[in-house]
C-alpha cells in the first residue's frame, strides 16, 4: 500500500477548530454588505478630528493594524490599573488613571478611523468588519473594569457586578438587533458618548483622586460614585428600549424571523446563560469569590462573552443559525460544578483554570475565524494589497 493511502481524515472537531465556517457560510459571507443607520450626538464634531487624524496615517498601514494597536493600548493601560487595584477598592497612583484616559482616547480615535482607512485604501471587506467588532467586544469588558476601578466601585459589590456586566449585555443587544433587522443602528447616545464619559471619569480620578467618589452628596445622602452608576442605569433603559423595539417588532426574514430565518428571541439564550451563570456563581460562592477577585472574575466571563458576541456577528454576516452549544462555557461550567460539589477544589484555583480555558478558547476561535476568512477572500489580515475582496457597499442612513 502506498504511504499515506490509508490515512484517515482529521476528526470533525479538529477541523472545526481550524475552519469554524462551512463552505456554505463562506459563500454567504461573500454576499454580505455592511449597512449602518443613524448618527450619535458627538459624531458630527468628532468627524472633523477623525478626518484630520486620518491624514497622518500612512496608506500602507492596514485598517486591522490600526484597530489592533488601539485595542492593545487600551488593554495594557487597563491592566496597569488592575495591577494596582485587584479588588476595585484600592486607590491607584494618579498617573494610572491618566494613562487609562489616554489609552481609551487613543483606542476611540483609532477605532473611529479604521473604517475610513479601509475606504481610503479600497480595502473594505467582511474580514475588517469582523475584526473591528471582535476587538470592540473585548474592549467593552476592559472599559467596564477600568471605569469601576476609577470610582472604587468595589465598596458596593452588587453595583460593581451590575456595571461589570451591563456593558456586555448592551453590546450584545446592539448586535442582536442587527442579527434581526440586518442593519446596525446607532442611537443618539451610543458608544462614542460612553467612551467620552469614561475619559472624563478617568480625568476626574486623576486630579481628584479615587476617594473623591466616596463624598456623600448632601440632601440626597448618596455617595458621588452612585451618580455615574445611575447614568449607566438610565443608558441601559434608553438603549435597550430601542434595541428591543426593533427585536420584538420582527425581523427581515420569513414571517418576521431573523436574517437567518430563526426566532428573533433565540440569541437571547446565549447572553442569558452567561448572565445567569455569573449571578449564580457570584451569589453561591462560599468564599465571596467575586468580592475578592472581581477583575479576574469579570475578565473570565468577559472572554466567554467576547466569543459569543463574535459568533453572533459572524452569524449575521453569514446569515447562519446561532447554536448554544459551545466549548467556551467549559470555564463557567467548572466553577458551577465546583460549587455543586461543595468546593472540592479551591474556588480561586478553579477561577484561574476557567480564565485560562475561556481566554484560549476565545483567542483560538477568533484567530481561526480570521485566518479562514482571509484565505477564502485572498486577503492579508495586517497588510493592504492590490488584490482585495469585492468592496462592501457601505450605507449610512440618517
Curated annotation (Swiss-Prot):
Family statement: Belongs to the CDP-alcohol phosphatidyltransferase class-I family.
Reaction(s) catalysed (UniProt annotation): CDP-choline + a 1,2-diacyl-sn-glycerol = a 1,2-diacyl-sn-glycero-3-phosphocholine + CMP + H(+); 1-octadecanoyl-2-(5Z,8Z,11Z,14Z-eicosatetraenoyl)-sn-glycerol + CDP-choline = 1-octadecanoyl-2-(5Z,8Z,11Z,14Z-eicosatetraenoyl)-sn-glycero-3-phosphocholine + CMP + H(+); 1-hexadecanoyl-2-(9Z-octadecenoyl)-sn-glycerol + CDP-choline = 1-hexadecanoyl-2-(9Z-octadecenoyl)-sn-glycero-3-phosphocholine + CMP + H(+); 1-hexadecanoyl-2-(4Z,7Z,10Z,13Z,16Z,19Z-docosahexaenoyl)-sn-glycerol + CDP-choline = 1-hexadecanoyl-2-(4Z,7Z,10Z,13Z,16Z,19Z-docosahexaenoyl)-sn-glycero-3-phosphocholine + CMP + H(+)
Binding annotation for Mg(2+) 1: 111, 114, 132
Protein name: Cholinephosphotransferase 1
Amino acids binding Mg(2+) 2: 111, 132, 136
UniProt site (Increases basicity of active site His): 129
Binding site for CDP-choline: 64, 119
Main subcellular localisation: Golgi
Function per UniProt: Catalyzes the final step of de novo phosphatidylcholine (PC) synthesis, i.e. the transfer of choline phosphate from CDP-choline to the free hydroxyl of a diacylglycerol (DAG), producing a PC. It thereby plays a central role in the formation and maintenance of vesicular membranes.
Organism: Mus musculus (Mouse)
